[in-house]
Amino acid sequence: MSQDLQKEVASRKTFAIISHPDAGKTTITEQLLLFGGVIRSAGTVKGKKSGKFATSDWMEIEKQRGISVTSSVMQFDYNGSRINILDTPGHSDFSEDTYRTLMAVDSAVMVIDAAKGIEAQTLKLFKVCRMRGIPIFTFINKMDRQGKMPLELLAELEEVLEIESYPMNWPIGMGKELAGLYDRYHRVIEQYRSEEDERFLPLGEDGDLKEAHEIQKSLYYDQALEEIMLLDEAGNDFSRERILAGEQTPVFFGSALTNFGVETFLRTFVDFAPAPSSHESNEGIIEADNPKFSGFIFKIQANMNPAHRDRIAFIRICSGEFERGMNVTLTRTGKSIKLANSTQFMADDRETVNRAVAGDIIGLYDTGNYQIGDTITNGSKKLEFEKLPQFTPELFMRVYAKNVMKQKHFHKGVEQLVQEGAIQLFKTWRTEEYIIGAVGQLQFEVFEHRMRGEYNSEIRMEPIGKKIARWVKEEDADEKLSTARSMLVKDRFDQPLFLFENEFAINWFNDKNPDIELTSLL
């Protein structure tokens, strides 16, 4: 790989934003896009009433509900770096999509609501990042409102997440009393709601302001200095190595809604976030500077442009250089594919991309070639990157087309939405009626909404309740074992499994059939 190309790869910063719903993830994404010069004004999720919608919430149902249910991809340049942001679903029902997205990034930004601290979904997603060993940057949001005390938030962060923290800045007051941020890294105080030329006040060697200023009259100024002294004496030492190893999280305070502390965060993040990392494969570690092009598909999205009924496969480039028109091998099938139609994104806006390098996320127009988890490369034809996580669904519904004359629309819709991985498809053993499985109820609502809106197919869903899915070997798929409490079905790859009513039904089945091995997904 040439030095120029190595430099280009090193400039990539590819990260996901994770949080619990309503922590302000979409708002901070909007502000980052603002600083990247991509949008002129940030439309927050509050725009549900005003008709202004967030850039990353492009799907109709997301606009209506104000939650992210698909992972958007956005790209911009900032301070010599190419930023690739993946905005992940905050809702727990879509955790599988989020988990797959986290396999495609080199670091994560965790957004925490200052009033609520660590919430359930944040903890779940944090654990995945920890499992991958990627750096995690923390942004404690909504400091313009009353919330938990900063020291309390730090203690909770370290205790619940079991990670070291290092506050890069420290709030001077909060809520109505918020006066500024003491920036430990840049050695300045950033004033809240001040003119641009007066916003940053330099600090002296003693840690206080070089010159007297009004902010020192704030009730919370002395308290902030005392807390910073405490952090200097008793807190963790700053360690770039531990940050890159995912063992220490730099913590930033701010307010995404009032755009306070966000650009300072972005500037610092770009300094510290890692360049594209290596990826594990069946042929060993594939480094980003490997000259052979390779990548994996972590997401498929149908109908990003409803007028064209298209399908886009999102690929994380792991090594080498992509050039439009190049020939690659889809290693799952051994098929040679010409990558003639490729695109980069700003939510639903897109432009053709002629070249991209390791770390970039690009979209490939898909006519049905790809599956989630596929590897493509112009190198070894047997290369496969590590498998992406798939969750065992817990809720199941039979699904039918209301209008039998529109079976074609119905089957196409089910097939495409299942290929996206947002919902899982099963069929009854003999009659092959459709059963769909999901992790949570919202997935069914989104499925129904999209079938109606994107495929013109009204559907009827009949709950068959909460079930426990367990796969069996083909030779063990005996229809005589199928009962109301242990229904034999097949998945979309025609692999047999039983849907059990409860743990008792599984235990009963195991007692009666000790030689049959039951397996689950994640």
Swiss-Prot record:
GTP binds at residues 19-26, 87-91, 141-144. Residues 10-277 form the tr-type G domain. It is found in: Cytoplasm. Gene3D superfamilies: P-loop containing nucleotide triphosphate hydrolases, Peptide chain release factor 3, domain III, Translation factors. One of its GO terms (molecular function) is translation release factor activity, codon nonspecific. Pfam families: EF-G_D2 (PF22042), GTP_EFTU (PF00009), RF3_C (PF16658). InterPro entries: EF-G-like_DII (IPR053905), EFG_III/V (IPR035647), G_TR_CS (IPR031157), P-loop_NTPase (IPR027417), PrfC (IPR004548), RF3_C (IPR032090), RF3_dom_3_sf (IPR038467), RF3_GTP-bd (IPR041732). It comes from the Bacteria. GO terms for cellular component: cytosol. Keywords: Cytoplasm, GTP-binding, Nucleotide-binding, Protein biosynthesis. The keyword Kinase does not apply. The keyword Disulfide bond does not apply. GO terms for biological process: regulation of translational termination. HAMAP family: Rel_fac_3. Increases the formation of ribosomal termination complexes and stimulates activities of RF-1 and RF-2. It binds guanine nucleotides and has strong preference for UGA stop codons. It may interact directly with the ribosome. The stimulation of RF-1 and RF-2 is significantly reduced by GTP and GDP, but not by GMP. This is Peptide chain release factor 3. It comes from Listeria welshimeri serovar 6b (strain ATCC 35897 / DSM 20650 / CCUG 15529 / CIP 8149 / NCTC 11857 / SLCC 5334 / V8). The gene is prfC.
